[in-house]
């Protein structure tokens, strides 16, 4: 019910109050979570794992935040439309096909391109770039650009002492 209710509130302030007081999330100042109709938040509070979204981070519409395993997103992170952050999976060799959960940690100044998928247990280092459509199955080192399925190193980003601020707040978001 939370997904359907909160996705349609056209007020940044009310949504952020909901995240903090009802879901127990920590959302930094200036963070923009553009929910719309297509973002889903699963496992929001019952697991006891924390969700933290840093200052000036932008999460665009159409993203899937599967938070049961825990989700830590740094500051000044740009998450493009359609990105999936999936902290859970299944033990495929277990007779009962049991599920398991691992946290996702995303460092500061990371850019995740459209429709990329980040799996549980992954850490993405500061300043890294995940190209559109990539499926990240291993940790990504700082300032590394990865792409493909599964994601592989494409190049290194020449970024020293990043200081930019993401500032994206549409009128009715």
Give residue ranges: language-model regions.
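A transmembrane-helix-recognition feature enriched in membrane-embedded lipid enzymes
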Residues: 1-30
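Left-handed beta-helix
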Residues: 29, 34-35, 40-41, 49, ...
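Active-site/binding-pocket entry motifs
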Residues: 84-85, 91, 152, 160
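A short, acidic/glycine-rich surface segment
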Residues: 40-44, 91-97
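Residues at secondary-structure transition points
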Residues: 9, 22, 48, 68, ...
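Short, functional N-terminal and low-complexity linear motifs
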Residues: 19-24, 45-47, 75-81, 95
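C-terminal segments of enzyme domains that contribute to small-molecule binding surfaces
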Residues: 96-120, 149-173
